[in-house]
Design a protein with these regions (language model features):
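Formylglycine-dependent sulfatase
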Residues: 2, 17-430, 434, 443-445, ...
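Sec-dependent signal peptide recognition
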Residues: 1-7
Length: 510
């Protein structure tokens, strides 16, 4: 048996030598807290995540890395390289919603296909409910995964679900776990029930292992985005995971999640391609900790769907043996949007941002997009110690600009004062004069609530910081005028339902 595995490794290694472009394995959790990884919490949570930690230990991890405030926004920022306000993908997608990636926006997958990559996405998508929004219509050769957050998936199992309303069931019930191919083949493999949730990530993992094997066997570089459903609520822990952490059902599932990451890393080793594979680990947004104990945790202020660091700042790490120095800790500002230009540069296309701005054909289709991301390859590979990103914009899911970070300073224009689940229900409070935080001296944004002399400090510091933030915003708005929002942010309520009638009457009066 050992001889067989040795020969198999040699065969795969030989095939891998036929391609020079790096493979790309992107591993994401869902709502993973910054503090839920032992590389960050240093054992304080009472369990370990050795496989995720391995990526950090063998590469670089970030301290000032930004996702977005919720699922759809974070995922769109990564795969499109654009600010969610530009694509209109700020709101969490729901069953039946006309919300998803528009055909005018190019994806990272399409760009990499142009570079000879085979592409696949396995696991949670959350970038559109309809067939037109499926990943296989946006650059992916294969998709196998679910389309929404877990609590939406299990709604039909609720005894009060209006299953007798045929129209509602037809239009707004969650679709099952979809397997689709770029040739148009779409198969619904069945609903994501509470029972299936216990092990569905293992289904996605097996598909990922098979895809990598096939890609290496073909001698082609691969781009694989593996999106687990863990650790979104409601957590349904597998029977064989119970007790793994000694810290309750949620952390048991977290350990199980880490074990699946380990299987992916081990498979790269077995295929002989680990040294030529970029592995990145992260999550979409900050934790949803108002559902504790079925929730993640972070040292940063508040949680997802707020303006605070806890809603946006997420764990992130990347490994590329021989290219990224082991054991690095990077304090530069980076965000999900930055991976499109960074990974394209790694694939040999360093000017993709300029190409797309001018207009270019990708995978046989014309695109003209503004990428909001920056190429971090020089920083990651040690050619510079200064990152290209100098600012970050905190957009709410309603499309409100709540804050701007420039350098170490954060100016807050609107704050979420609600606690617990009310952060989803209550409006942001717009401030007549903004709050100010220094995210090096006060990374957890405690000063306005805990410091006796905050207002005195504020008066001395805020005027130039507001000016700098306004200048940064003006630069962004100039690009937004040239490349305007693709669609209006969606709503959870009914406020937009009357707009077509108002607009119709307005047109008649003109």
């Amino acid at each position: 048996m050992r001889l067989f595995l040795f020969i198999l490794t040699l065969v795969f290694a030989g095939n891998a030598m036929g391609q020079e472009k790096p493979n790309m394995l992107i591993i994401w959790g869902d709502d993973i807290g910054f503090w839920n990884l032992s590389t960050n919490n240093m054992g304080m949570m009472g369990y370990e995540t050795p496989n995720i930690d391995r990526i950090a230990n063998e590469g670089a991890k970030f301290t000032d890395y930004y996702g977005q405030q919720s699922c759809t926004a974070g995922r769109s920022a990564f795969i499109l390289g654009q600010s969610p306000i530009r694509t209109g993908l700020t709101k969490v997608g729901s069953p039946g919603a006309d919300l998803g990636i528009r055909p005018e926006d190019v994806t990272l997958a399409s760009l990499l296909k142009d570079e000879g990559y085979v592409t696949a996405q396995f696991g949670k998508n959350h970038l559109g409910d309809k067939d037109e929004f499926l990943p296989t219509n946006h650059g992916f050769d294969e998709f196998f995964g679910n389309l929404y957050h877990l609590n939406a998936e299990e709604e039909p199992e609720d005894p009060d679900y209006p299953s007798d309303n045929e129209l509602l069931v037809k239009l707004f019930s969650p679709r099952g776990v979809i397997h689709s191919l770029a040739d148009g083949d779409i198969v619904d493999t069945g609903p994501l029930t509470r029972e299936r949730m216990k092990t569905v990530d293992r289904e996605f993992k097996l598909a990922a292992l098979d895809f990598m094997t096939r890609a290496v066997d073909q001698g082609k570089p691969f781009f694989l985005w593996y999106n687990t459903t863990r650790m979104h609520f409601f957590t349904h822990t597998a029977d064989d995971e119970r007790g793994l952490s000694g810290q309750g059902f949620y952390n048991d599932a977290m350990v199980g999640h880490d074990m699946m990451v380990g299987e992916l890393l081990d498979h790269l080793d077995a295929l002989g391609v680990a040294d030529n594979t970029i592995v990145m680990y992260s999550t979409d947004n900050g934790p949803h900790y108002n559902t504790w104990p079925d929730a993640a945790i972070t040292p940063f202020r508040s949680e997802k769907n707020t303006n605070w660091e806890g809603g946006f700042r997420v764990p992130a790490m990347v490994r590329w043996p021989g290219k990224i120095k082991e054991g690095q800790i990077i304090n530069e500002i980076m965000s999900h949007e930055d991976w499109v230009p960074t990974l394209l540069a790694a694939a040999g296309r360093p000017n993709v941002k300029e190409e797309l701005k001018a207009g270019v054909t990708v995978d046989g289709k014309p695109y003209k997009n503004h990428l909001d991301g920056f190429d971090f390859l020089p920083l990651l590979t040690g050619k510079t110690d200064v990152g290209p990103r100098k600012s970050f914009f905190y957009w709410s899911d309603d499309g409100v600009l709540t804050a701007i970070r420039t350098g170490d300073w954060k100016v807050v224009f609107a704050e979420q004062r609600a606690k617990g689940f009310a952060v989803w229900r209550e409006q942001f409070d717009e401030l007549r004069i903004p709050k100010l935080f220094h995210l090096r001296r006060d990374p957890f944004e405690r000063a306005d609530e805990n410091a006796d002399n905050y207002e005195d400090w504020w008066v001395r510091k805020v005027p130039p910081r507001i000016a700098v933030a306004r200048m940064e915003l003006q630069k962004f708005l100039m690009t937004l005028a040239q490349f305007p929002p693709r669609q209006r942010p969606a709503t959870f309520g009914v406020d937009q339902m009357m707009e077509p009638l108002y607009n119709q009457q307005k047109s008649k009066n003109q």
